[in-house]
């Protein structure tokens, strides 16, 4: 087995892929009207909506902040989509190479069964339409730190359902890509996903952090399932999707109550994941530094910490990077900040 096969999950199909790209736009911007390259739109703001198709593009709003002046729209672009549709509540659009989809399940006293059905439908759609390489998922979970009707934390309830879908589909947790599981202020659970018809997908781990699906049961009856990053593309290029990254070493939260310390460790973890040594270990030849990361979403639990997090990020990220700060809850109650991004 190659080094890539030992250290990172590599899957390849024969079609060359150059991954879609993201832009952050002002919600309601007239620039979005009539743009035939739009693959999907996610509005981040102070309310939520059901998923829909607008001009052939999947669209939804997630309640991920608490002030209207912090709202923005995450716009995904690719070639002009060749087809779009709705299946089992999933709004999707596809090009020859990519599939982008959005699905939501409403608020409930229990989420495991609904989450299992949601992910089962996502897996079935990617297979039936011919996009077997799931490259990135985002999960926005309302009341993520509250308890469900059985007294189980909602995030843990969600993880049980996602794991059930993998069990039922015979899917190896190591094949699950980069992901975000983050709080929302309402709206149930919204899942956004990107899949590819072909190319190469390599899941990347962090040598300083335990692989998520190996977490001990102290974090819940079923562990989360995601890679720390996923590289997608042809051998000569590609895009690196970086999961929401926190102040965790091993499997433990560090710097309890200290948002500066947690933010610094989160950025250290991100730098470690995308660095040349770690990527080579996984079979990706080109390394990166934090200055290469763009289109970052930074999730901050406490509003009073927003300015501190903004300063820490500004000191370590590129001055030209698009960075959006969102005031929302995080999967672990002792985590104060998580950071995600991507590298072209």
UniProtKB/Swiss-Prot annotation:
What EC number(s) is this enzyme filed under? Answer: 3.3.2.13
Swiss-Prot/TrEMBL catalytic activity = chorismate + H2O = (3R,4R)-3,4-dihydroxy-3,4-dihydrobenzoate + pyruvate
- State the disulfide connectivity: none
SUPFAM superfamilies of this UniProt entry?
A: YjgF-like (SSF55298)
Q: Where does substrate bind?
A: 155, 162, 215, 228
Q: Which residues catalyse the reaction? A: 338 (proton acceptor)
Enzyme superclass (EC): hydrolase
Keywords assigned by UniProt, alphabetized: Hydrolase
Highest taxon of the lineage: Bacteria
Outcome when changing residue 338 to A: Loss of chorismatase activity
For this protein, the parts annotated as crossing the membrane are: none
Spell out the subunit comment: Monomer.
Summarizing the function annotation, the protein's role is: Involved in the biosynthesis of the macrocyclic amino acid-linked polyketides FK506 and FK520 which are potent immunosuppressants that prevent T-cell proliferation through initial binding to the immunophilin FKBP12. Catalyzes the hydrolysis of chorismate via a 1,4-conjugate elimination of water to yield (4R,5R)-4,5-dihydroxycyclohexa-1,5-dienecarboxylic acid (DCDC).
Name used for this protein in its record: Chorismatase
Q: Which gene encodes it?
A: fkbO
């Amino acid at each position: 087995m190659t080094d890539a096969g030992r250290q990172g999950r590599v899957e390849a199909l024969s079609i060359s892929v150059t991954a879609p790209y993201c832009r952050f736009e002002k919600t309601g911007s007239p620039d979005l009207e009539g743009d035939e390259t739009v693959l999907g739109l996610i509005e981040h703001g102070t309310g939520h909506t059901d998923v829909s198709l607008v001009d052939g593009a999947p669209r939804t709003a997630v309640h991920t902040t608490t002030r209207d002046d912090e709202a923005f729209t995450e716009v995904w672009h690719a070639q002009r989509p060749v087809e779009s549709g709705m299946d089992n509540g999933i709004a999707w659009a596809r090009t020859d190479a990519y599939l982008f989809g959005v699905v939501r399940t409403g608020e409930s006293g229990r989420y495991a069964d609904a989450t299992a059905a949601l992910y089962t439908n996502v897996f079935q759609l990617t297979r039936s339409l011919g996009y077997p390489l799931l490259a990135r998922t985002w999960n926005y979970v309302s009341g993520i730190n509250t308890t469900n009707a059985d007294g189980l934390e909602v995030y843990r309830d969600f993880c049980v359902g996602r794991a059930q879908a993998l069990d039922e589909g015979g899917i190896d947790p190591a094949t699950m890509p980069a992901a975000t599981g983050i709080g929302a202020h309402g709206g149930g659970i919204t899942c956004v996903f990107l899949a590819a018809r072909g190319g190469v997908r390599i899941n990347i781990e962090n040598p300083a952090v335990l692989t998520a699906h190996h977490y001990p049961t102290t974090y819940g009856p079923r562990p989360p399932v995601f890679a720390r990053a996923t590289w997608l593309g042809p051998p000569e290029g590609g895009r690196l999707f970086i999961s929401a990254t926190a102040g965790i070493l091993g499997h433990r939260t560090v710097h309890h109550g200290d948002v500066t310390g947690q933010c610094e460790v989160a950025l250290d973890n991100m730098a470690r994941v995308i660095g040349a040594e770690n990527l080579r270990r996984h079979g990706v030849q080109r390394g990166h530094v934090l200055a290469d990361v763009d289109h970052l979403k930074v999730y901050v639990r406490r509003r009073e910490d927003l300015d501190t997090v903004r300063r820490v990020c500004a000191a370590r990220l590129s001055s030209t990077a698009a960075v959006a700060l969102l005031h929302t809850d995080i999967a672990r109650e002792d985590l104060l900040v998580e950071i995600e991004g991507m590298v072209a």
